Amino acid sequence: MAEICDDALLLRRIPFSDTSLICHFLSKEHGRIALMARGARRPKSSFRASLEPLYALQISWRPGRTGMGTLVDVQRGQSLLEPSLSLHGLELLAIASRLFQEGDPHGFEETEAALVLLAERASQQGLLAAVWYLLDVAGWLGNLSHCWHCGAEAQQTMFWQHAQLLCESCGKGMPVSVGLRKSIVAVMSGGHVRFAARDAATWSEMIRLVLQEHSIKATDSFKG
C-alpha cells in the first residue's frame, strides 16, 4: 500500500518485543493512530533520535492491510517547549492521550494549541490553562459568568459540584470566588495574572474533579 505522510505529535511509546516499539501519535489529517516502529529499540536505529515527545514531527507510514500500520520514517522538527517545561508538557500529553482515543479524528490541533498555552503562560498557570483548554474543547466546561445548571447570572460566590459551576440555588460544594473566575478568564485570554496560592489550588482541584467526573486518570499535578 502507498505510504502516508503527516505532521504528528508523539503521545507514547510502548516496548514491543526486544527490538520494536508501538507508537501512538496524534496526526494532523488522520487523528490518533498507532504504528509499529520496527527495530526502533536497536542501538543503531534511525528512530532512536527522532521518536521523542514534545517535538514537531513529520511521520511516514504504510497502513496495515488488516491491523496496525508500520512506521517508515520520522523527521524531527523543532522543540515545542523549553526544557524547564518538559515535565508539564509530558503531563499534558498524558491527558491528551486519555482524551483522544485511537480512531478519533481530532486531537492534533487541540493539543498543539494547548502546548502553545503552556509555553506562553507563567509556569504556575501554564499547565492549568493548557489542561483547562483541552477540557473546554472536549465540551466539558461552560461559561464562568453563568450557572451551568439553570443559566442564571453568576453570583459573587459560586460553587463547584459534580464538575459544574453552580449557583447557590442549584447546589453547594467548593466555593469559587468571583476573583478566581475573572482570573481564569483573563489567563485564558492571554492576560498576565498573579494567582494567590489558594486560587491556584482551587483551579487545580476544579480540573481534577472534571477529570474524575469523566473517568480520566489525573496526572501527578492534579492528584488530590
PLM-predicted stretches and their roles:
Residues M1-L21, L26-G224:
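Non-catalytic alpha-helical scaffolds and adjoining flexible linkers that form interface surfaces
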